[in-house]
Amino acid sequence: RRILHQLIRKEGVKLNNLTDIKSMTLDELTDFVTENGFPKFRAKQIYDWLYKNVTDFDDMRNISADLKTFLKSSSYISVANIEKKLVSRYDKTVKYLFSFNDGECVESVVMSYKHGYSICISTQVGCKMGCTFCATGKSGFSRSLAPSEMLGQIETAQRDLNIRISNIVLMGMGEPLDNFDNVVKFLRLVSSDNGLNIGMRHITLSTCGIVPKIYELAKLHLGITLSVSLHAP
C-alpha cells in the first residue's frame, strides 16, 4: 500500500502541469476546446461525460480520436477514491476517507434523513485555523481542495451508495472561507443545471468566522445558508 501511495503522489506531481478539466465551468471548457482548434459542440459532449462519472477520456465514446489525444496530453480528470468506509450500526451514517490524484486524503460523511440524504464535505486537506475543539487543525495544513475534488466527494458517495444527495454541508476538514475562490466556484458548479443541479438553498457553509470573507460572500447573493461556529478562536 505504501508503494501504491508513493506512485500516486508521483503521478500527482506530473498532474500539476495539466489542466484540471472538471474544475471548469461549461463556458470555460468551451473556450478551452475552441482555443485549441476543436468545434464548440465538443465542449458540451465532454462536460456531459464528466458528469456521468467518466474518469478516462477513452471512455468518451462520441469524442473524436484527435480530441482524446489532445485531452490526454493537456488535461486530467480529478477522482475521489474510497480509501476507507465506516457505517454506523445505529443510523447507517457513512463516513468516508477519500484520496485524490496526488495521494492526499480527506473525510466526508453521508447522513440519511426523512427528507433525503445530506453530505458533509471537506474543503481543504488539514486546516490553518487552529480551533481547539477540532482534530483537523492538530494535523497541520497541506493544501486547499480544487472545485473538482469537492464535487468528487459527492459523486463518489452517490455512486457507492446508489443514492441521490440533496443537501450539502461544507463542514468537513478545512475552513471553506480560507479557500474562498475554489469554494465559490464549486458552489456554482454543483448547483448548475449542467452539473449535479443541487440548489443553493440546499447548501450550508460552516465557518469559524473570517469576517472579511463573510462580507465578500454576502455580496455574491448566492442564497446558501451560512453557519458560524461560536466556539472558534
Regions found by a protein language model. Give the residues of each.
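Conserved Radical SAM active-site core
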Residues: E104-G223
